[in-house]
Amino acid sequence: MSEPIDLSQIAPTLKAEILAEALPYIRRYHGKTVVIKYGGNAMTEERLKQGFARDVILLKLVGINPVIVHGGGPQIDHALKKIGKAGTFIQGMRVTDEETMEVVEWVLGGEVQQDIVMLINHFGGHAVGLTGKDGGLIHARKLLMPDRDNPGQYIDIGQVGEVEAINPAVVKALQDDAFIPVISPIGFGEDGLSYNINADLVAGKLATVLNAEKLLMMTNIPGVMDKDGNLLTDLSAREIDALFEDGTISGGMLPKISSALDAAKSGVKSVHIVDGRIEHSVLLEILTDQPFGTMIRSH
């Protein structure tokens, strides 16, 4: 077991200030669920990985219920490269043939998930890994990708799914027993196939079904940026639609922002896009009043 974080070098008055600032937020979120989409640099840099593990443990210790949905794009790309296969994306979604799906399952449900679970447990937490196939968690259907160049037509991108339904029973059971669920975004279809589902979409749907108080989506940029590279700290549904139209939001940000907006419209009270490259970004967003990232609003 790793030694706990050494706070001896922090002056007592500063410790008191930190705790005093956090206390109202601890009270506000006590007993509430926070869904965190975990990805990007925060999953690959050791310092950030350790900081994230400690953050979610602290949340659990103060009575907040974190639920983690993780990505793993770089790890999947690396595994595909080993077998001589290139990754292909359309509108931010990975084209997933049968061979790619096999790689996705063992990378996300094995290597990536277990790395997260082991790190949380190493620092004294109690995490349990799941895929959407466990406990009937995520029912999926094949995603029909609209062809933007041919209205009314669709592009076949293989075993890529969208969430048809979520059965949260297994997640709630783990929460009740003081575990931290770590979920790989793989669903199962009525056709018996596994489906690769964008982790942002899973996080948004799960936050809605769990009646989460907050949804955090970690990324490798400060938040949503305008065309001049300036951070947009607060976005309404109308403003987001305009950014979609003019191409400011594109590529991998499309499913992320769409999912965030859907969650906000579905009743998730607080939805934020945060910079996962900043150490302890989860705690900074939840337990301080420091403006951070981009807030997504439904109105």
Curated annotation (Swiss-Prot):
Molecular function in Gene Ontology: acetylglutamate kinase activity; ATP binding
InterPro entries xref list: AceGlu_kinase-like_sf (IPR036393), AcgluKinase_fam (IPR004662), ArgB (IPR037528), Asp/Glu/Uridylate_kinase (IPR001048), NAGK-C (IPR041727)
Catalytic activity: N-acetyl-L-glutamate + ATP = N-acetyl-L-glutamyl 5-phosphate + ADP
Record's subcellular location: Cytoplasm
Record-linked Pfam families: AA_kinase (PF00696)
CDD domains (alphabetical): AAK_NAGK-C
Residue(s) at site: Transition state stabilizer: 37, 256
Record key words, sorted: Amino-acid biosynthesis, Arginine biosynthesis, ATP-binding, Cytoplasm, Kinase, Nucleotide-binding, Transferase
GO BP term, example: arginine biosynthetic process via ornithine
Gene3D superfamilies: Acetylglutamate kinase-like
Residues reported to bind substrate: 72-73, 94, 196
Pathway: Amino-acid biosynthesis; L-arginine biosynthesis; N(2)-acetyl-L-ornithine from L-glutamate: step 2/4
Listed NCBIfam families: argB
Record function comment: Catalyzes the ATP-dependent phosphorylation of N-acetyl-L-glutamate.
Record protein name field: Acetylglutamate kinase
